[in-house]
Amino acid sequence: MANKYDNIPLNVILDNIKDKDIFANTAEVICSMRETVTFSKFFYIPANCFRDMNYVIAAINYIITPFGYKASWNWLHDVDVSGNYCIHLFLDEI
């Protein structure tokens, strides 16, 4: 499923990610999902990184889409643990 971030140039996407660690951490989780054939996973992110997630997923999709996969995410409402939000990451074959 396409979203408004899919057609933004990669350099613009990367410039909009304030916390580069969340990008690296999310990419690591996505990679582990493929290795273990797990296509969804819960993942905790700092509350201040919430705004970055659309850009993080768009950047990851630039890398994995040519290999037949697409990542997405969904926020789990009202799940806040010590200032971290729980999100649900998805990895779909396309």
What are these regions (language model features)?
Residues 31-90:
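Acidic, low-complexity, intrinsically disordered interaction modules
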Residues 93-94:
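Short acidic DE-rich linear segments
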Residues 1-50:
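An N-terminal amphipathic alpha-helical segment
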